[in-house]
């Protein structure tokens, strides 16, 4: 049986602003759009952490639950919770089969967490994952570099709009969450 997949998640820390955006499309296989308004970006840990997922929906919900438990266990320490989740994800036989990736951020860090055990912090304060991730990443980097007066939210929305114009698995039903200083 084919799974539900494909999305684009984009996150940026820019000019003191922190934003994460995701589209709303859920695709079944390669031919059918099952939902247009899914919410793939969430607020966690007393609204101080943003998390977005790309991949299998059921797998992503499992990871959200595990990550939120790690945040509670480590009192909101994003980096420690991320490393501990990645270690568990990589070493657990059941979790290892999950097909999803997470981007998580707070006001101090922006991180990519993968099932192979990586926890990656970007050099430029921008991350993107999912089927339209490379398009969003390119657009976001260009905007950050050449239109530095834009807010983090404006760049996140524009990056998702660009990805949605190119990637058939990304739509224009964009959800944006922000953290403010």
UniProtKB/Swiss-Prot annotation:
- What GO cellular component entries does it have? HslUV protease complex; proteasome core complex
Concerning Pfam families, the annotation shows: Proteasome
Active-site residues per Swiss-Prot or TrEMBL entry = 7
Q: Identify the CDD domains for this entry.
A: protease_HslV (cd01913)
**What does the entry give for GO biological process?**
proteolysis involved in protein catabolic process
Q: Which GO terms describe its molecular function?
A: metal ion binding; threonine-type endopeptidase activity
Reactions this protein catalyses: ATP-dependent cleavage of peptide bonds with broad specificity
Record-listed Na(+) binding positions: 164, 167, 170
Which keywords fit this entry according to its UniProt record? Allosteric enzyme, Cytoplasm, Hydrolase, Metal-binding, Protease, Sodium, Threonine protease
Activity regulation comment: Allosterically activated by HslU binding.
Q: Which Gene3D superfamilies match?
A: Glutamine Phosphoribosylpyrophosphate, subunit 1, domain 1
Its main subcellular localisation, reduced to a broad class, is: cytoplasm
Could you tell me the EC number(s) of this protein? 3.4.25.2
Per UniProt, the enzyme's principal EC class comes to hydrolase
Localization in the cell? Cytoplasm
On subunit structure and binding partners, the annotation says: A double ring-shaped homohexamer of HslV is capped on each side by a ring-shaped HslU homohexamer. The assembly of the HslU/HslV complex is dependent on binding of ATP.
Query: Which family does the record claim for this protein?
Result: Belongs to the peptidase T1B family. HslV subfamily.
Function comment: Protease subunit of a proteasome-like degradation complex believed to be a general protein degrading machinery.
Q: What is this protein called?
A: ATP-dependent protease subunit HslV
Q: What is the originating organism of this protein? A: Shouchella clausii (strain KSM-K16) (Alkalihalobacillus clausii)
């Amino acid at each position: 049986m084919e799974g539900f997949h494909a999305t684009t998640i984009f996150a940026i820390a820019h000019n003191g602003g922190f934003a994460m955006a995701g589209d709303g499309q859920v695709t079944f296989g390669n031919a059918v759009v099952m939902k247009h308004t899914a919410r793939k970006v969430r607020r966690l840990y007393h609204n101080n952490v943003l998390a977005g997922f790309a991949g299998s929906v059921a797998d992503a919900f499992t990871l959200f639950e595990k990550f939120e438990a790690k945040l509670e266990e480590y009192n909101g320490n994003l980096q420690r919770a991320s490393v501990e989740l990645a270690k568990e994800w990589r070493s657990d036989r059941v979790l290892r089969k999950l097909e999803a990736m997470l981007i998580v951020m707070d006001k101090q860090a922006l991180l990519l967490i993968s099932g192979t055990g990586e926890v990656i912090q970007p050099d430029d304060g921008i991350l993107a994952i999912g089927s339209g991730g490379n398009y969003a990443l390119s657009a976001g980097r260009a905007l950050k570099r050449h239109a530095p007066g834009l807010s983090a939210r404006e760049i996140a929305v524009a990056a998702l709009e660009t990805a949605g114009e190119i990637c058939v698995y990304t739509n224009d039903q964009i959800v944006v969450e922000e953290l403010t200083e």
